[in-house]
Every structure is written in C-alpha cells, then in structure tokens.
UniProtKB/Swiss-Prot annotation:
Name of this protein: Small ribosomal subunit protein uS11
Positions of disulphide bridges: none
GO molecular function, one term: structural constituent of ribosome
UniProt subunit comment: Part of the 30S ribosomal subunit. Interacts with proteins S7 and S18. Binds to IF-3.
Pfam family, one: Ribosomal_S11
Family (UniProt): Belongs to the universal ribosomal protein uS11 family.
GO cellular component: ribonucleoprotein complex; ribosome
Taxonomic superkingdom: Bacteria
Matching InterPro entries: Ribosomal_uS11, Ribosomal_uS11_bac-type, Ribosomal_uS11_CS, Ribosomal_uS11_sf
Its biological purpose: Located on the platform of the 30S subunit, it bridges several disparate RNA helices of the 16S rRNA. Forms part of the Shine-Dalgarno cleft in the 70S ribosome.
Example GO biological process: translation
C-alpha cells in the first residue's frame, strides 16, 4: 500500500504588528541590498537589486536600488510598519534613490544615518583602474 504524503512542518511566516523599525541600505558599485528590521534587529523584509530581477551591471543602477527598496517597503508595510530609521552604508549609486523610494512607498523616515565604515589607514586599497 502506498504511503500518504506527509506535510512538512516548516515555519510559516506569521504576520506581526511592528509599527517602527530600521532600514539598512547597503549600496555598493555592483548591487544594492535593502533590509528592514524591527527595533531588536530581527529581519522583517529584505530585497536586493538581484532579487528584484536585475542582472549583471544593471544591479548597480539607481533604478535597481529604487525597485529593491519599494519591494522591501511593501512587505514591511504589510507587517504593519509605519516609521523607520534609515542606515545607509557604502559608496554606490543607489543610496539617495533607495531612501526616496522608502519614503514614496508610505514609510515615515525619522532618521537618516551614514554608517559607511571608514578605515583609519587600515588595509591598502586596490590599485587605480587604468582604462
């Protein structure tokens, strides 16, 4: 006799009501990643330019960062988020557009902080490109 297929007991995402949290925008030259967390740092939603459907060099564009930020913000608003503090990291092109996209999606931004790590003369940087 054939065995009945058993359901896997995976953890189902429950909808929690989180009114305010933090948004971390990591913007490099090659990609942009937007992570939205609650006050404790537990991830509520995230999106990147790659997960939004962009490939190759297009991932580093401001439009790709905007699309990723809108996607992450939409999922956070579904969880009940209203206010966020924005932490921006990295030298990429999508920094400002991602912040504007979060604001345009309906989230109220209470703080913007640049947390880009700056060395106090640490590692030697890569050599300059000669094209």
């Amino acid at each position: 006799m054939a065995r009945q297929p058993t359901k896997k007991s995976g953890s189902k995402k429950q909808k929690r009501n989180v009114p305010n949290g933090m948004a971390y925008i990591q913007s490099t030259f090659n990609n942009s990643i937007v992570t939205i967390t609650d006050q404790n740092g537990d991830v509520i939603s995230w999106a990147s330019a790659g997960s939004s459907g962009f490939k190759g060099a297009k991932k580093g564009t401001p439009f790709a960062a905007q699309t990723a930020a809108e996607s992450a913000a939409r999922r956070a608003i579904d969880q009940g988020m209203r206010q966020i503090e924005v932490m921006v990291s990295g030298p990429g092109a999508g920094r400002e557009t991602a912040i504007r996209a979060l604001q345009g999606a309906g989230l109220e931004i209470t703080l913007i902080r640049d947390i880009t790590p700056i060395p106090h003369n640490g590692c030697r940087p890569p050599k300059r490109r000669r094209v």
